[in-house]
């Protein structure tokens, strides 16, 4: 029978890989209502606590009054409004680049940049643990596609030696399921030495890394010559929605001409851009948010290590607890939820087989007391997994 979807779904259920959407019935924040239950959440990417900030909300409301609620058309027709342009200028300033280009989603930004820059006769090389949108962009581009070993400049160099045509090296800045940082200085040196361009998706670094929140490129003290193509998202640390590509004048003009996900879609609501302008202002001005977040990360890592939990090498708000077995990861997530804590279990195919984990994410909106509540609950629940295996 064609399209036997029931069999595919049953197979996924049997492997403990079936996914369901929790229903959020409250604004984003540490304390949420999900499926009718009040919970303390550690699974949002609202890293700076701006998604429900009153000034950001007020900016959106004022933007709707001034500009309406719809983009109305694509950017190249009559959908590129003054707030969109102002956001692009603010993002160029934040990232220290000549220009930036606004996209509706991070997925579209990644697909648009890759497919506009490389095609048949070219080469795209990607880290094995890159986000799905980057991998999809590489496959859709029509270029020769290969993956190098995770965060391994030597592995990249060996593949660059076999590359043909224009060559684009693509990596996450912060790897979303592990929380570790790409070795950008080494990757940039390898790429530049072989005439390749380096593209970095800094979805999880923008706003949280760098003294000014400029992200992983600022964190490492690199520039546009080291990382010609920089991607960032606005739905995480910025607390709103959308994404951007930042780079040279020529890069942005090329994307306007050739990036199909940019050309053939309606622009985001101008009021959303007004909200993003305010969140970018808060990101720059309220440096205490990054400082407080860094303190929470230290607190969690020290406490988790004392409990004997297996963490990954992450200096970021993403703090995965590796469990291994998918069923056990789901069980620990359920045990925590019974105690009023929401921590999501991440399973294959999102992560490699045998590496299921609880993906703890911290926010500047959390308090030290809330992080301690999580550690106390883990101290109570984690040993129950070991007892079940005994």
From Swiss-Prot:
Q: Which cofactor does it need?
A: pyridoxal 5'-phosphate
- Could you tell me which SUPFAM superfamilies the record lists for this protein? PLP-dependent transferases
Reactions catalysed: 6-carboxyhexanoyl-[ACP] + L-alanine + H(+) = (8S)-8-amino-7-oxononanoate + holo-[ACP] + CO2
- Where would one find coiled-coil regions in this protein? none
The EC class name is transferase
The domain of life for this entry's organism is Bacteria
Q: Which residues bind substrate?
A: 19, 131, 350
Self-association state and partner proteins as the record states: Homodimer.
Query: In its UniProt entry, what is this protein called?
Result: 8-amino-7-oxononanoate synthase
The organism that produces this protein has a lineage beginning with:
Bacteria, Pseudomonadati, Pseudomonadota, Gammaproteobacteria, Pseudomonadales
